[in-house]
């Protein structure tokens, strides 16, 4: 897979339909985002949901109703700048599309949510390997039994991403990722996956499977795929999200998100 270094060039490839893959490892140093697009009539409700669940839904950008632009994150058009989208109807995933131009409506509001792909550069700089990047695959993600804070129709369960590492690396990972609350921050769990309702660590709900090597433990971070579970629970007539792993690459630098 080709790797790009600057988000403007990368998004041009996406807009032109030349890149449709997962975005882990693309444009090191720049923030990636999850996406949820909802009708205006439920946007305030979803905003309350995000504020109730900041670990899973750290907002980094919100559009004006009807606009697909997020100027604070760069020269971005949400209709065309992600490699793959999922369309939900009545709470169920109905289709996958690569462009939203024909689906866009004047009442839609876009929410960009920080993604843990953004702190992976800092992990690697600190000597913590990120195996899904090294192996060229997507991070495994799991639906847990951790209930989200309920806001009106929006609830569901938390989704987590998993990265395998040694116990010593996990300690370092906690130190590093605690600096980045805008992209999920510190892990929510490490060790026994059954304690958060994950029955089989080698069968993720999203992403790609990744077996633990001897001496490794699973480390779990809250994930921006969580809003998709909230959309399912709300049974909205219409909503759009990114396909898990296929993120919006912004022009916001990760270093600007560090809390300390």
UniProtKB/Swiss-Prot annotation:
<protein>
    <recommendedName>
        <fullName>Putative hydro-lyase Daci_4977</fullName>
        <ecNumber>4.2.1.-</ecNumber>
    </recommendedName>
</protein>
<dbReference type="InterPro" id="IPR009906">
    <property type="entry name" value="D-Glu_cyclase"/>
</dbReference>
<dbReference type="InterPro" id="IPR038021">
    <property type="entry name" value="Putative_hydro-lyase"/>
</dbReference>
<dbReference type="Pfam" id="PF07286">
    <property type="entry name" value="D-Glu_cyclase"/>
</dbReference>
<dbReference type="InterPro" id="IPR016938">
    <property type="entry name" value="UPF0317"/>
</dbReference>
<keyword id="KW-0456">Lyase</keyword>
<comment type="similarity">
    <text>Belongs to the D-glutamate cyclase family.</text>
</comment>
<dbReference type="GO" id="GO:0016829">
    <property type="term" value="F:lyase activity"/>
</dbReference>
